[in-house]
UniProtKB/Swiss-Prot annotation:
Membrane topology field: Lipid-anchor
Protein name: Ras-related protein Rab11A
Modified residues (Cysteine methyl ester): C223
InterPro entries for the chain: P-loop_NTPase, Rab_GTPases_membrane_traffic, Small_GTP-bd, Small_GTPase
Designated gene of the protein: RAB11A
Length: 226
């Protein structure tokens, strides 16, 4: 289970650092989702991200302190040159579309293809339909997104950065899944350590993806008021 950490970095010892990337078209609310998670803030005057920025937040998962390093980039084509550096080292990804703009959902397969071309094959991915507070403007049926997520093996949630609906759940779902995968690797390594097959796993762990076990089946979650 994950428990909320401070908005800002705590002074506690960090056990893991997980890099998670936000991707999707411009103006779907990626930066707003990040601001809500990292600082519990929302601004109607938020400007489009130029280039790349990242923020951090610490959480406790299974009594371990995890620093989430969340990267946000512009969705515009002219900034696509940052691709390789942006995805390098990422162990989680959030594919974001706007439920009121069908085009942003229709572009998700392209973003997913780019992600899979540049990131580790075992990266944990969640599909996010943002702005679910705008019920009367919905242009993407929840079932369409659920079906796509199931077909591609992704987690799925609808969120509202404005109302803080499911934002925390989206991040903790990804981070907890990453932690579970890493923890299984650590246990396997500990078992082989007696045979001299593994280096010590003590101390801070900066998690970089590599060959790993298969990621378990994903869950689908829809927008619900907390």
């Amino acid at each position: 289970m994950a428990s909320g950490g401070g908005y800002g970095d705590a002074n506690a010892k960090i056990d893991y650092v997980f890099k998670v990337v936000l991707i999707g078209d411009s103006a779907v609310g990626k930066s707003q989702i990040l601001a809500r998670f990292a600082r519990n803030e929302f601004s109607l005057d938020s400007k489009s991200t130029i280039g790349v920025e990242f923020q951090t937040r610490t959480l406790v998962i299974d009594h371990k302190t995890v620093k989430a390093q969340i990267w946000d980039t512009a969705g515009q084509e002219r900034y696509r040159a940052v691709t390789s550096a942006y995805y390098r080292g990422a162990v989680g990804a959030m594919l974001v579309y706007d439920i009121t703009k069908r085009q942003t959902f229709d572009h998700i397969p392209r973003w997913l293809e780019e992600l899979r071309n540049h990131a580790d094959k075992n990266i944990v991915i969640i599909l996010i339909g943002n702005k679910c507070d705008l019920v009367n403007q919905r242009d993407v049926p929840t079932e369409d997104a659920k079906e796509f997520a199931e077909k591609e093996g992704l987690f799925f949630l609808e969120t509202s950065a404005l109302e803080a609906t499911n934002v925390e759940s989206a991040f903790t779902t990804v981070l907890t899944e990453i932690y579970n995968i890493v923890n299984k690797k650590s246990l396997a390594a500990d078992e082989s350590q007696g045979n001299g097959n593994s280096a010590s796993l003590s101390g801070q762990k900066i998690i970089i993806p590599g060959p790993a076990q298969e990621i378990p089946a994903k869950r689908n979650m829809c927008c619900q008021a907390s």
